Amino acid sequence: MPELIAIAYTEETVAAQAAAELDRCAAEIPLDPDAIGVIVAERNGSHQLLTSRHPGATAAWSRFWGVIFGVVMNEDEPSELDLSFRQQVKGLLRPGSSVLLVAVKRVTGETVLATVSQYGGKPLTCPLGAETTTGLWADPAG
């Protein structure tokens, strides 16, 4: 079953560094590079969602990240995403911090965590339902 991995960092630049490492290793893991997102909690209290779009990416990934950002930042929004997970991620987004988000299907969470272990961080995981992941992976097998 697909899942969403969130790794929280106390510094605002670390999640982007970990995302770059996952992007670099994406072919060997294997991980869809569009399945990586970062939320940065700016020091002024605003939040920013960072994603990268690779050649051949579908609009489904843009939609997915928009939904994830929306439900994490607005706990009252209905979602398949576990409320406790959403509250925990939002609670870890203190000014000057960041969270790496990775949607996985074929890759295990352990593989992702091992790839970015040098950055530390607090990991959380949450299963992703079919409604949330529709159209993300072209191959139904993953």
Predicted features along the sequence, with ranges:
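Positively charged, small/polar-rich N-terminal and surface patches that mediate targeting and assembly
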Residues: 1-99, 103-142
